[in-house]
Structure formats: C-alpha cells, structure tokens
C-alpha cells in the first residue's frame, strides 16, 4: 500500500482550476479517467482508469498502475506482457477529473491486449446510415493469445 | 432529435473487438468517454462524454456534440464561444467504450473554458511527498470571463 493521499476537492473553483494543489476528483466509483499517449510521437495508446491507490503508486514508482474495471483489481500494466509504461509526464485537466500520461512503453512497444500498439485501431464512419468500423491495418506486435493464455489445469 | 441508433453490444468478444459494426458501450449513465485531439499536431485538447444523441449528432453533422455532466444537457461545443470542433476523424477502441475525435477547432482555436487551447495546462509531480501542479504557462486565447458572462438581470 502507498501512504500518499490526496486532498479533497477545494470548494473554490479558482483554486481547483488555477491552483498548485493536486486534488484529483474521483467519480462516485472512486476512479479518474486516464488518457495515455506515447511521449515520443503523441500517438493515443489507450484510455483507462485509476483509483487513489493506482494513482499514488504511479506517482511514486514512475510506472503506470491502473484500476481494472473488468477484473475489479489493481493493475500494474505490463505485468503479464512485459509492456510496462514508464511515465515521462503526468498532467491533469482544468477541473482535475481526468489525467494525461505521456509514457514510454517497454517490451514490445504494444499497449492493446490484442497485441496492437494502440487500442484505437478502427475508424468510425456512417455507411448507408449505419455506424461502421474500418480497421486501420495495424498488426499485433506480440502473440496476445500465447502471452495471455491461462495455465492449463 | 436524430434517428440514428446504435446496436447492442455483441456477446461475441471477437465481433466487439475485430468486427465492423459500431456498437458503442455506454456506461450505466448512458455515456461514453471521448478523447479529443487536434487533427494537425495531435495535441490533447480535452476529455468529455457523449450520450447516444450527442454521438449521433456528431456523426451526422461532423461537428462535435457532447453531454455536459455538470449541466445535464446536450452540449454543442462552441455554441457560446464560437470554438466549434470540426471532426476530421472518429475512432473507437478495442472494447468500444471510448472514442477518439481528431478535430479542427474553429474560432479562437481554444478548447478549454478557461480560454486556453487545451484543458491539460498543468503537470503533476511529487514535491515533498505531495501531489503538486505546475502551470505550463499557456495563455488564454480569448476572454473567457467576457464570453461566458451571464446576462445581467
């Protein structure tokens, strides 16, 4: 566990938006939204969430930790795949309910669980009045099926 | 109102992650998270949310519409400031619960309600064991106080 805590949201809007005190606004589930981009070329890699513990560990270790909403568990990104995220810079937005991590991805330089570099590999458009996705052709950088296989019982 | 609807999330994971049908996964509040970057230089401008209506209007008009969680209302970004967002490209992520808009900002080329170009104008770091924000010095591009003033009664 980390000892690092975060102060409550100030009631003064100016303090929240222009101040120097980091007081992240966690949602009712205790999470903030995190946008993750590549520090070198700015590519959007993923959108994830952090609770206070994941955020504290990220600040203290410089390695990105998240809260997995699907597994309901703390998630040190890269623990299985080796694709850890080294945090080059963290930013927050005007009302401190979102974070931006600029990272260097280790391992295969892949962030998506499908093996691709980015989770955003499909464009959205309207075709005959229906929302339609087009794959941008980006290829897996590692064998996700092998990496994330479950141990046989 | 828009007539455009969105199909339910497929139960098949492969269809969700690799398919061509756009089936955005709205959260229990009916929203998806939207990351907005500048189409030209990739700068992260803001994080916002869309409900189905805002998403449909965005796809149909090519101008970004959001759902304002603070005002509980549909929000055509730029309606007050003139800083509309023209959508150059929309993408979705592997499990279709987040969207990425690459936009050209009209008007003052400013996205933040403080008048700055981006909402992410402060870095986060640890100073003496406390989360501390440092302003990056980006200046307002329009007079937010004047633009968003309330009409006197």
From Swiss-Prot, chains A, B:
Binds 1 Mg(2+) ion per subunit. Binds 1 zinc ion per subunit. It catalyses: 1-(5-phospho-beta-D-ribosyl)-5'-AMP + H2O = 1-(5-phospho-beta-D-ribosyl)-5-[(5-phospho-beta-D-ribosylamino)methylideneamino]imidazole-4-carboxamide. Pathway: Amino-acid biosynthesis; L-histidine biosynthesis; L-histidine from 5-phospho-alpha-D-ribose 1-diphosphate: step 3/9. Its main location: cytoplasm. Keywords: Amino-acid biosynthesis, Cytoplasm, Histidine biosynthesis, Hydrolase, Magnesium, Metal-binding, Zinc. Zn(2+) binds at residues 94, 112, 119. The keyword Repressor does not apply. Its cofactor is Mg(2+); Zn(2+). GO terms for cellular component: cytoplasm. Its EC number is 3.5.4.19. It is an enzyme of class 3 (hydrolase). Catalyzes the hydrolysis of the adenine ring of phosphoribosyl-AMP. PANTHER family: HISTIDINE BIOSYNTHESIS BIFUNCTIONAL PROTEIN (PTHR42945), HISTIDINE BIOSYNTHESIS BIFUNCTIONAL PROTEIN HIS7 (PTHR42945:SF1). This is Phosphoribosyl-AMP cyclohydrolase. It comes from Mesorhizobium japonicum (strain LMG 29417 / CECT 9101 / MAFF 303099).
